[in-house]
């Protein structure tokens, strides 16, 4: 039977060994003369070391720490901040994210899991309203939520997004501080990435990288934060390093949030700026655009040169012509000739002007500029139309660009809600339960705690080019059963459907009480009439 295999003889074993060696020698031969022009020594052309197109492209392999070390990260952050300040396209990309991802803020709507908690839908709705009111008390007041008492939670959302995109990451501590007139003591303290690092600029360790201390599985344990900015010395304040534990020792609550722009590799401890891949083309494009703008300015200058012959006699000029130039003229303090708007330059005897015509505006500037911006936008996941706010194509093309950009905005919105909004809300619910502001039976159970803390975060609506077409499409999706009124209302208005329908019911009731038409003929169904005699 097959389990009892006959043992090979010595001759057969020698033959099998010879065959194995022969096959190995054949398989190990270099491959030559691949198709497509020019021979290569590898099976994959991208791995070749002899092709001229890739001969000088020999990157190294390294760990996430080596490939994104301290010095490179600091340079990327510095250049990203400078681009945000001075580069038009870079600032447009960041502000476009802030406006469309956060806008006026992500509004929280509690959605407790009533099935897991054993509640009826009516009881769950009452509890949702109670939790929403508590959250509004905290989120709407800067003194409640912000450690600096300057921004409410919705403004903090925008600041967290911008800081993480520009610097790569931002940290949020949650110190407890009692304030007169405040209900809660949980404060949100934003910490810039510059302040998080190894104590006293020390070297990385096996369990400490760039100020992030982690355990054997790579989970963060603590963050090392400087009391100020390294390299900045203020009178009367010395720089010290504080170790902030990520989780509470007794409760296990999250005490420090780490909001990263992107985590692209397992084991990566710090985030890279959003603009990192496009910093080089951004800088070149900014220089090119500035040079073209300056050339156009010079070309627009109208300057008159007065050329004097050898026999020119200044005695024939009136005295006013010999006086000094007034402020704003073309005369400079060092006697140099300068161009100006409508300037008149007096040349010396024998001097002759040489005009260099810059031929501006350059007809090739716009196509080239647009092509480069398209590449930058593709790397940033922003279509050209959305990045430049230039919707000059057809309706279908403009709508496709908006939809593609909206996918990216939705991703960033979900990321912000997961990393900042929802964790900060859970901290507030924890404190509300501890203070007795809300009764949540079984909250100490981790499963029930998650059921109580469930919520949705609703941001500004997507917007539409043709609202009538979008409304008709929404109605059709509801009609054929692929969507519902809750989803469509949130997508089109950014408001919860329950809140919209309650307000609409109040409006219809008010109009009926004043003998006004309740709804247009093409409107939604009106609420049931409890007094048919009125009709």
Please report, for each region that a protein language model flagged, where it lies by residue.
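Surface-exposed loop-to-helix/strand elements on domain peripheries
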Residues: 125-128, 341-465
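Extended, charged amphipathic alpha-helical segments
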Residues: 250-398, 444
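Short coil/turn segments at secondary-structure boundaries
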Residues: 148, 175-176, 296-301, 387-391, ...
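Structured, mid-chain assembly/scaffold modules that mediate subunit interfaces
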Residues: 95-258
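Charge-rich, acidic-biased intrinsically disordered regions
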Residues: 151-157, 174-191, 312-331, 424-459, ...
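Acidic/polar, glycine-anchored loop/turn motif associated with catalytic or activation segments
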Residues: 218, 376, 488
């Amino acid at each position: 039977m097959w389990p009892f295999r006959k043992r090979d003889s010595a001759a057969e074993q020698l033959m099998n060994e010879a065959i194995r060696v022969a096959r190995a020698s054949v398989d190990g031969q270099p491959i030559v003369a691949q198709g497509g022009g020019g021979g290569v020594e590898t099976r994959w052309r991208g791995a070749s070391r002899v092709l001229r197109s890739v001969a000088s492209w020999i990157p190294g392999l390294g760990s996430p720490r080596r490939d994104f070390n301290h010095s490179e990260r600091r340079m990327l952050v510095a250049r990203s901040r400078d681009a945000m300040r001075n580069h038009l396209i870079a600032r447009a990309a960041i502000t476009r994210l802030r406006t469309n991802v956060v806008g006026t803020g992500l509004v929280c709507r509690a959605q407790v899991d009533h099935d897991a908690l054993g509640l009826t839908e009516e009881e769950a709705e009452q509890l949702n309203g109670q939790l929403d009111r508590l959250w509004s008390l905290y989120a709407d007041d800067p003194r409640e939520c912000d450690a600096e008492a300057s921004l409410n939670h919705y403004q903090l959302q925008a600041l967290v997004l911008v800081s993480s995109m520009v610097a790569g990451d931002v940290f949020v501590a949650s110190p407890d501080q009692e304030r007169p007139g405040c209900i809660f003591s949980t404060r949100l303290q934003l910490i810039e990435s510059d302040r998080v690092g190894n104590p006293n600029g020390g070297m990385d360790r096996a369990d400490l990288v760039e100020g992030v201390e982690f355990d054997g599985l790579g989970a963060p344990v603590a963050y090392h934060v400087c009391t100020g900015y390294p390299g900045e010395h203020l009178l009367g304040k010395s720089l010290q390093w504080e170790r902030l534990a990520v989780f509470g020792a007794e409760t296990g609550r999250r005490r420090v949030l780490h909001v990263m722009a992107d985590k692209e590799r397992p084991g990566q401890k710090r985030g890279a700026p959003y603009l990192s891949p496009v910093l080089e083309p951004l800088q070149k494009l900014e220089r090119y655009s500035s040079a073209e703008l300056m050339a156009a300015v010079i070309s627009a200058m109208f300057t008159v040169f007065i050329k004097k012959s050898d026999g020119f006699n200044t005695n024939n000029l009136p005295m006013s012509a010999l006086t000094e130039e007034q402020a704003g003229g073309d005369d400079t303090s060092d006697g140099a000739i300068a161009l100006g708007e409508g300037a008149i330059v007096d040349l010396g005897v024998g001097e002759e002007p040489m005009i260099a015509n810059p031929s501006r505006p350059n007809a090739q500037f716009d196509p080239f500029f647009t092509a480069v911006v398209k590449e930058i936008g593709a790397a940033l996941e922003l279509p050209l139309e959305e990045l430049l706010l230039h919707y000059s194509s057809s309706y279908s093309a403009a709508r496709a660009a908006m939809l593609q950009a909206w996918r990216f905005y939705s991703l960033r919105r979900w990321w912000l809600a997961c990393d900042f909004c929802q964790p900060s809300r859970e901290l507030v619910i924890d404190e509300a339960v501890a203070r007795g502001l809300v009764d949540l039976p079984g909250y100490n159970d981790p499963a029930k705690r998650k059921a109580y803390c469930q919520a949705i975060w609703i941001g500004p609506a997507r917007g539409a080019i043709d609202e009538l077409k979008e409304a008709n499409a929404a109605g059709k999706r509801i009609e054929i059963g692929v969507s519902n009124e809750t989803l469509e209302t949130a997508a089109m208005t950014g408001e919860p459907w329950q809140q919209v329908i309650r307000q609409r019911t109040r409006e219809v009731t008010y109009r009926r009480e004043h003998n006004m038409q309740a709804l247009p003929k093409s409107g939604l169904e009106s609420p049931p009439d409890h007094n048919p005699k009125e009709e």
